[in-house]
């Protein structure tokens, strides 16, 4: 509860400063629901310096993302989700230069099932915000292109959108392939 209060205060501040969109990134889209008691247990475990299991991390990330998305929907914000960057791959260079210093690359995880479940869990509560989905792995262009149509509604034109080709795909081939996938699935 206290964490949610702190997060809401930060969202309030960003909104006061004119912000109307958020940006989130996942190497791999998580989806594992948990109740408040489980989340409290996981949070306390992390605060105690204990290592979390992959399941616990997924529970926490899922519910945190759902919290953010619901709040964005209530406020009429847009939400960007960037999927598929694997960070800081070169340990030697990480040690020498620090994080995010040019040693990131494309991740290769399944996207469709967890992303669909995450979006659907918000949609059934009518709290799915306007969303822009980005993928770094071009193998997921068709997945996202098809996914867009699943959650459109009359609340907003193009409520769920496919973000432009980015990073390693921000080139003529990447942009063409993305637009072709979008056209073929739209």
Outline where the language-model segments fall.
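Histidine/acidic residue-rich metal-binding segments in metalloenzymes
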Residues: 1-130, 139-157, 174-186
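Short His-Asn-centered micro-motif
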Residues: 25, 133-137, 163-165
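His/Asp/Glu-enriched short active-site or ligand-binding loop at hydrolase and phosphoryl-transfer sites
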Residues: 159-171
């Amino acid at each position: 509860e206290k964490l949610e209060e702190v997060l809401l205060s930060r969202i309030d501040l960003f909104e006061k400063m004119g912000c109307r969109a958020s940006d989130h990134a996942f190497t791999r889209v998580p989806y594992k629901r948990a109740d408040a008691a489980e989340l409290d247990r996981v949070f306390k475990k992390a605060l105690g310096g204990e290592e979390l299991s992959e399941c616990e991390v997924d529970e926490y990330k899922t519910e945190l993302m759902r919290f953010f998305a619901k709040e964005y929907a209530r406020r009429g914000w847009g939400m960007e989700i960037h999927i598929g960057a694997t960070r800081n791959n070169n340990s030697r260079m990480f040690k020498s230069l620090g994080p995010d210093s040019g040693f990131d690359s494309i991740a290769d995880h399944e996207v469709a099932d967890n992303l669909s479940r995450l979006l659907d869990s918000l949609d059934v509560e009518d709290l799915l915000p306007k969303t822009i989905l980005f993928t770094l792995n071009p193998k997921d262009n068709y997945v996202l292109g098809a996914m867009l149509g699943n959650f459109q509604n009359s609340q907003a034109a193009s409520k769920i959108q496919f973000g432009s080709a980015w990073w390693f795909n921000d080139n003529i081939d990447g942009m063409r392939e993305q637009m072709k996938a979008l056209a073929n699935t739209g």
